Amino acid sequence: MSADVATAAAAPRLALFDLDGTLLAGDTDVLWCEFLIDEGVLDRETFGAANRDVAERYGRGEVTPAEFAAFYAATLAGRSAEQWSPLRDRFVAIAIAPRIGAASLALVAAHRARGDRLVLTTATNRFLTAPIAALLGIADLVATELEVAPTGTFTGRTTGTVNMREGKVARLARWLSDEGLAASSLAEATFYSDSINDLPLLCAVATPVVVDPDSRLRAEASRRAWPVISLLA
């Protein structure tokens, strides 16, 4: 079914992909927090329950973009990208790569074969998701950006617009401008997402495709006659 969606239109265009719960069977931020707890970097008592709470409220569309971004940005505070990279790379190999299924890779490959420009757009920060985009073979990434101190360490805060909800639409519009692409490209795009948090962007594209949704997004898809596919089978 996913390949049919990818080949439905002949002309190349933007193919936008959410990451967590869409191409990835899991949530990068949640898995990162769990990984750091298991590694002894984060305190289980302090972060374990809070991680689950933020994840559950995010899934229900109840957590604010600022709260979501601040909680997970804080897990990286005090170290530089260079200092974090060995642990980050091991995390991607152990916790992320096995959760990217054949159906997700086939969908991305179908759009690539069609000549579409592939963009991964995610609320998760760029530091964690850049190697995941590379793993998927997606060159363009729009992600939440982390603030870096003059010393080169992450401050534990984000900078700019959090790439979540309406922020995803705003960030993509800015990305189109930066890339010299027409603003109308967004209205002609395809976007794949599992999350009710992505409703603003799903409504902004020509071809919204709902992937393994929860009940709220499934109801929206049914009401709007959007296609629903599964990448988990």
Report each predicted region and the residues it spans.
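Acidic/polar active-site rim loop that often engages polyanionic ligands
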Residues: D29-W32, F68-A69, P150-R157
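Amphipathic alpha-helical interaction elements
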Residues: L24, R60, A73-A77, A130-A134, ...
